[in-house]
C-alpha cells in the first residue's frame, strides 16, 4: 500500500513563538464529540503531519488520518470538545483538512471556555472563530481576537466531515506556586518559548523545548554549515523565572553534525520586549561556560552551572554550528 505524505507547509512567521496548546504530547485530549464513526477524534491532535494510506480500510470504511464523522442525515452539525494540554491565551487556529478532499466540512467555527475543574457543561463558552468556509486538503489559519485564558475548546463542523489536524496556537498561561518542586522551567508544557535565532535552516529551535527525546534528526535545532567566523545562537524565555540547578543538553541523532561546543548565557529581566533582548543577549553572563559536545548523547551538568539567583531568559550558543535536539533547565520557581 502506497503512503502519501502531507505537502510541506510553512507556518506563518507570526506563529513561530507560539505553542500549539492542542498538542497531544503536552497532554491535550478529547473530552467528547458528537460522532467519530469513520476516524477517531484523537488523531486530530497528533503532532505528526497527516498521511494518506492508499487501499487501507477498516470496519467502518476508508481509514483516514484525522477526525471524521458519518454523513449527517438530519438537521444539525458535528462538534468535538478538546481539553488543551495547558491553559493559554489563543492567538490563532489552524484547521487542517489535508487528504480530506470529498469529505471535508463545508465550514467550521470554534468556541472556548475556562474550566480548570473540567466541568465544561457549566462553563461559559465564548466565540473564538465565527463560522468560516473550509476547502479541500489544505491548511486554514485564522487569527483569534480574544484575550481571555482558555482550558478547553469546542470545534464545530458544518454539517459533518473530516479534519486532519487541529492546532491551537497561543501563549501558555501557567502559574506554578510550588517553589519546592523541581521541574524543567524551559519546557514547552511549562511555558517556555523561542524568541529569536541566528539560523534554522534544517530544524527550528522551538524543537529544543519539545517533550521527550527527539524522534529523529529533524526533531531538533540544526543550522546550515557556517562558512564565516562566529557561531549560531538562539534566545529562549522560561515559562516562569527560577533558579537553575541542573542543565541537560541532548544531541540525540546528531552524529556527524553536532556542535563542537555549547554555552548558555542567562539573565533575569522584566518588561523588556523581545526585539530589545536580541542585542543585549551578547553581554549576558554565562550560566554554563562552553562545554565540549559528543554525538547522540545527553550531557548533564550540575557543578558546572554558574550561580544565578533568578533566570528568566537564556541564550544558547552552538559553536560553531550544527544541531542539538533538546535543552532542559531543571530548577525551582523563584
Curated annotation (Swiss-Prot):
Q: Name one GO molecular function term.
A: allantoicase activity
| UniProt xrefs under Pfam families | Allantoicase (PF03561)
One GO BP annotation of this record: purine nucleobase metabolic process
Q: What is its EC number?
A: 3.5.3.4
* Pathway involvement of the protein, from the record: Nitrogen metabolism; (S)-allantoin degradation; (S)-ureidoglycolate from allantoate (aminidohydrolase route): step 1/1
Where exactly are the transmembrane stretches of this chain? none
InterPro entries per UniProt: Allantoicase (IPR005164), Allantoicase_dom (IPR015908), Galactose-bd-like_sf (IPR008979)
Keywords per UniProt: Hydrolase, Purine metabolism
Query: What Gene3D superfamilies does the entry give?
Result: Galactose-binding domain-like
Q: Does the keyword Hydrolase apply?
A: yes
NCBIfam families annotated for this entry?
allantoicase
Protein family (similarity comment): Belongs to the allantoicase family.
Q: What is this protein called?
A: Probable allantoicase
Organism lineage:
Bacteria, Pseudomonadati, Pseudomonadota, Gammaproteobacteria, Moraxellales
